[in-house]
Amino acid sequence: FAPSISSFIFLFPIFLFFNFIPMASVEVESAPVAAVETTTPAEVEATPAPEVTKVEEPAPVVEKEVEVESAPAPVEEEAAPVAEEAAALVAEEPAAAEPTAAVAAAVEPVAAPVEEPAAAEEPAAAEEPVAAAPVEEAAAPKAEPEEAPVSEPEAEKAEEASPVSEEPEKVEEIIQWLMNDGFFFIIEVWLCLFSFLVEYFIYYYYYYILI
């Protein structure tokens, strides 16, 4: 059986069959390459999270207010039993004027220290807005410069990664085609284009033998 056009008609469907089978494997192998690239931007978004916690600082200022308010409470409790004792002494000895004056003198110094913590509260309250104001002013400039530079490298990385990912995919497709289809393609080309030469050679060879 000499190869001729009939061989091309017979083998061409086989060549088409082997040509379209490996194309599915190329798509399956290129899929995980694209999936790995999608995981990279997640790391960039996780960086600005710890920097936001620096703003929470005015908490200790509130604790000082509670301490100042709690200080005068025991002074008022001590003044109440002293006044009751003075009233009891006056009821028992109404004739004596000197002890009542001594008790009144003892009651007066107790009322004086009650006004001192109130005076201490006024400067503390005046200092609070001064301390709270710079905290808010310092927090505002921190948030502005952090958000702007984060978006720029993401866009640059996406532009740089897109052309790099296309080249290896093309190389893999070419290598796979040469490994799977290249051999069949070369055989088909030689059989189709040079089958008539082989045919003439066989005819010439038989003609030489017969002569």
From Swiss-Prot:
The keyword RNA-binding does not apply. Keywords: Repeat. The keyword Disulfide bond does not apply. Residues 114-152 have a biased composition (Low complexity). Residues 114-167 are annotated as: Disordered. Sequence repeats lie at residues 56-61, 76-81, 84-88, 92-97, 107-112, 115-120, 121-126, 127-133, 136-140. Residues 56-141 are annotated as: 9 X 6-7 AA repeats of E-E-P-A-A-A. Stolon, also expressed in leaves, stems and roots. This is Induced stolen tip protein TUB8.
